[in-house]
């Protein structure tokens, strides 16, 4: 039984030495389960995503350019064709004045009866 205990003790010591040994560079770039767990370095880098190298340099974010600068003009005069839109508005206003809608008074005049009176 001493032989079995000695082998088991030697096995444990071997495992501890492997853990304390410096990590060797692994050139395997596969991320399958078998390759992620085949050595301690691959487990740390591929399995857990832990890397101990200098972080990559990140560019500073540049302030966004003013795409819509504040304009001192009113909203109605900002458009490209401000003159044509004003002409179009005048046409709409004149057409509304020339063709009044039929209301209660106009209906009464057309029918010849007073509105609201019943026979």
Curated annotation (Swiss-Prot):
GO MF, any single term: RNA binding
Region annotation Core: where it falls in the sequence: 43-53
Q: Give GO BP annotations, semicolon-separated.
A: positive regulation of viral transcription
List all membrane-crossing ranges. none
Keywords, ordered alphabetically: Activator, Host nucleus, Host-virus interaction, RNA-binding, Transcription, Transcription regulation
Where does the record place Polar residues bias?
71-87, 107-119
In the UniProt record, the signal sequence range is: none
Q: Give the InterPro entries listed for this entry.
A: IV_Tat, Tat_dom_sf
Location in or out of the cell: Host nucleus, Host nucleolus
Region Cysteine-rich: what ranges? 26-42
Assign the protein's first listed, main location to one coarse class.
Answer: host cell
Q: Where is this region: Disordered?
A: 61-119
Motif interval(s): Nuclear localization signal, and RNA-binding (TAR): 54-60
- Cellular component annotations (GO), alphabetically ordered: host cell nucleolus
Q: Which family does it belong to?
A: Belongs to the lentiviruses Tat family.
Q: How does it assemble?
A: Interacts with host CCNT1. Associates with the P-TEFb complex composed at least of Tat, P-TEFb (CDK9 and CCNT1), TAR RNA, RNA Pol II. Interacts with CCNT2; the resulting complex is unable to bind to TAR RNA.
UniProt function note: Transcriptional activator that increases RNA Pol II processivity, thereby increasing the level of full-length viral transcripts. Recognizes a hairpin structure at the 5'-LTR of the nascent viral mRNAs referred to as the transactivation responsive RNA element (TAR) and recruits the cyclin T1-CDK9 complex (P-TEFb complex) that will in turn hyperphosphorylate the RNA polymerase II to allow efficient elongation. The CDK9 component of P-TEFb and other Tat-activated kinases hyperphosphorylate the C-terminus of RNA Pol II that becomes stabilized and much more processive.
- Protein's name in the database: Protein Tat
Annotated source species? Simian immunodeficiency virus agm.vervet (isolate AGM3)
Gene this chain is encoded by: tat
